[in-house]
Amino acid sequence: MEAYKAEINHKYEFIAKIPEWLFGFTVGIRKKAIDCLQLSQGSSVIDVGCGTGASFPFLEAVVGESGTILGIEPSGNMISKARERVQSAGWKNISLVEKTIEEVDEIERFDGALLFAMHDVFNSLQGLQKIRSIVKDGAHIVCVGPKLPDKGIQRLFNPGLNLLFKRMAISQDNKDKPWRLVAEQFVTESIIEEKQGLIFIYIGRK
């Protein structure tokens, strides 16, 4: 596990240095994904691989001050930025844990789970089983990330996407259908394609 975390930190050092405005195109997708969680005021949600906390403002808008948000992030660089974001905004209902999801102890059960650009977790049976164990019956899991298009002119993007996967993920499995293993652990409700099939939103339910 320590070697795995070291490799994750190495990859995420690169991501942490990317200016956040370059990910501006994901804001609409992020909002749509959070809407798909079907949360409400007072809900609890776990943000698996929360990174710098880019989803926190949108989650806060949904769950409110009476709700709770737990951010799980193995990268020290990323979670330090998430802490700065939380402190700057004055959010009191967000907790952060510097661990992989596989390392997280049994904790309270959540009303939803968000996984944004977490290809390694999408392909971790242990990680997905842990998520399943800590969400409530009927809770939604929403996964978002890039995928390799399997038809049309969009396939021309595949060489570049393959380089992206190699740079940002350890696992290189299921790049055409990153939700494949998730769908074995949860009931699939919908799979939405964005950006001409380059990005997916998977909505599942326990």
What are these regions (language model features)?
Residues 46-102:
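Class I SAM-dependent methyltransferase SAM/SAH-binding core
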Residues 202-206:
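C-terminal lobe and adjacent flexible extensions of AdoMet/dcAdoMet transferase-like proteins
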Residues 112-125:
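A short SAM/SAH-binding and catalytic strip from SAM-dependent methyltransferases
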Residues 127-137:
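A short glycine-rich, Lys/Arg-flanked "PGG" loop and its adjoining helix->strand segment in the class I
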Residues 144-194:
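C-terminal alpha-helical "lid/dimerization" subdomain adjacent to the S-adenosyl-L-methionine
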